[in-house]
Regions:
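A short core secondary-structure module
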Residues: 148, 152-186
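Internal helix-loop-helix
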Residues: 49-119, 160-166
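C-terminal helix-coil-helix/basic helical segment that borders enzyme active sites and/or dimer interfaces
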Residues: 26-38
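Conserved, non-catalytic sequence blocks in retroelement Pol enzymes and Pol-derived host proteins
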Residues: 38, 63, 131-133
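A structural signal for short hydrophobic beta-strand segments in well-ordered beta-sheet cores
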Residues: 140-143
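Residue-level signal for inorganic ion chemistry
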Residues: 11, 22, 74, 104, ...
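A short, Trp-centered hydrophobic/proline-enriched beta-strand micro-motif
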Residues: 118-127, 169
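Intrinsic disorder at enzyme termini
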Residues: 1-10
């Protein structure tokens, strides 16, 4: 049997809506965003209201439950007009997934819907000067001091770091030899 790679009617409708939104709402403001280095919060919330942020996340957490292919289509459509704006979807999807799978349920129920609505803008701190985005080679250390962790080291290339409300930072909590198994998220 052959695999069917055709988009469903729902995927086509979402794709057309996202592409139209990108052309009509995002593309006209590209030069201004590029000059000011900032994405308008109203635009982000509008994307959230259309279900464009975290589309593959469960409906119970504010997503569309639409799957990764649909989410990828949305990201591609938004990137067509402005790659920087597409980071909102990309980071929202990554952070939403991490929280929905690894955070306490009450944290996921509180934070993920705000990400999907575009009310909370997020970033992920993984990349380091010495190892790029190789999670097994992270040097930034997290050491417990009583009830707190103290992070010591460097991160670089945190997309949208100057605009976000929340950031997850990946840091080493165990031996270097343990590679990715000794990495925690803060």
């Amino acid at each position: 049997p052959r695999m069917d790679f055709a988009l469903s009617d729902e995927q086509r409708a979402i794709h057309e809506t996202a592409l139209r939104f990108a052309s009509e709402r995002i593309a006209p403001g590209y030069a201004a965003r590029e000059q000011h280095g900032e994405i308008e919060r109203a635009l982000i919330e509008e994307m959230g209201s259309l279900g464009f942020i975290g589309a593959e996340l469960p409906e119970a957490l504010g997503g569309l439950g639409a799957g990764s292919v649909t989410s990828g289509l949305i990201i591609e459509d938004i990137a067509y007009a402005d790659m920087n704006v597409a980071y909102v979807q990309l980071l929202g999807s990554l952070m939403g997934w991490m929280l929905s799978v690894h955070a306490r349920a009450e944290v996921a129920r509180e934070v993920v819907p705000k990400i999907c609505q575009g009310k909370t803008l997020v970033a992920i701190g993984l990349t380091e000067p010495s190892g790029g985005s190789d999670a097994g080679n992270l040097k930034l250390r997290a050491e417990r001091h009583g009830d707190e962790y103290v992070l010591n080291g460097e991160k670089t290339s945190i997309s949208m770091a100057d605009q976000v409300d929340e950031t997850v930072i990946f840091a080493r909590t165990g031996a270097q030899e343990a590679r990715a198994k000794a990495i925690s998220a803060f």
